[in-house]
Amino acid sequence: MPIGVPKVPFRSPGEEDAVWVDVYNRLHRERLLFLGQEVDSEISNQLVGLMVYLSIEDDTRDLYLFINSPGGWVIPGIAIYDTMQFVPPDVHTICMGLAASMGSFILVGGEITKRLAFPHARVMIHQPASSFYEAPTGEFILEAEELLKLRETLTRVYVQRTGNPLWVISEDMERDVFMSATEAQAHGIVDVVAVENTGDFT
């Protein structure tokens, strides 16, 4: 039986009594954001809205985006990435569990020097795939052209943000490339592998 989203007590400044809010609402108030599902338009719009709102509220405090995602749709993922580059606060990205496909693209989009993976996290990069294999031929050709443009965009970002040469990223994107946290660090996707039990996210 599902338990739903856990609730935690929260006391607003100046209020005597605490109110019960869902745990994510409470964490958002501390500027902690979560991508714990496939990337789609709904979660993309939620994260974009939260990043913009929290930036307006205080543009000097960093944001923290925790990622455990198998990937998902390319355009919603690019929307999250672009927003991370646009908002004034630095966005830390933290990989826990898995950051695959668009999950790894969002991970690499964190502020350089502030991208972290938990010790047992996994990262996977590959090229974008089409979901319209049964479309009429004309539509399929247009889809293929668009996919090529998207692949070029993703490749360019990986090259820029990892420091790897174009040929390395191009080869990596030909197939599914899975990495451990330390391999992702060596590859330039994350900057730091978390040390267990430090209790410090800064």
Curated annotation (Swiss-Prot):
Q: Where are the transmembrane segments?
A: none
Q: Which InterPro entries match?
A: ClpP, ClpP/crotonase-like_dom_sf, ClpP/TepA, ClpP_His_AS, ClpP_Ser_AS
One GO cellular component this record assigns the protein to is: chloroplast stroma
Record-linked SUPFAM superfamilies: ClpP/crotonase (SSF52096)
- State its Enzyme Commission number(s): 3.4.21.92
The main location is plastid
Which keywords has UniProt assigned to this entry? Chloroplast, Hydrolase, Plastid, Protease, Serine protease
Cystine pairs: none
The record's active-site residues are S101 (nucleophile), H126
Q: Say which domain of life the source belongs to.
A: Eukaryota
Q: Which Pfam families match?
A: CLP_protease (PF00574)
* Entry's Gene Ontology molecular function annotations: ATP-dependent peptidase activity; ATPase binding; serine-type endopeptidase activity
Tell me the compartments it is located in.
Plastid, Chloroplast stroma
Q: Does the keyword tRNA processing apply?
A: no
According to UniProt, the reaction catalysed is: Hydrolysis of proteins to small peptides in the presence of ATP and magnesium. alpha-casein is the usual test substrate. In the absence of ATP, only oligopeptides shorter than five residues are hydrolyzed (such as succinyl-Leu-Tyr-|-NHMec, and Leu-Tyr-Leu-|-Tyr-Trp, in which cleavage of the -Tyr-|-Leu- and -Tyr-|-Trp bonds also occurs)
- PANTHER family documented for this protein: ATP-DEPENDENT CLP PROTEASE PROTEOLYTIC SUBUNIT (PTHR10381), CHLOROPLASTIC ATP-DEPENDENT CLP PROTEASE PROTEOLYTIC SUBUNIT 1 (PTHR10381:SF15)
What is annotated about its quaternary structure and interactions? Component of the chloroplastic Clp protease core complex.
Function of the molecule: Cleaves peptides in various proteins in a process that requires ATP hydrolysis. Has a chymotrypsin-like activity. Plays a major role in the degradation of misfolded proteins.
Family recorded in the similarity comment: Belongs to the peptidase S14 family.
Name used for this protein in its record: ATP-dependent Clp protease proteolytic subunit
Organism source for this protein? Drimys granadensis
Q: What is the lineage of its organism?
A: Eukaryota, Viridiplantae, Streptophyta, Embryophyta, Tracheophyta
Please state the gene responsible for encoding this protein.
clpP
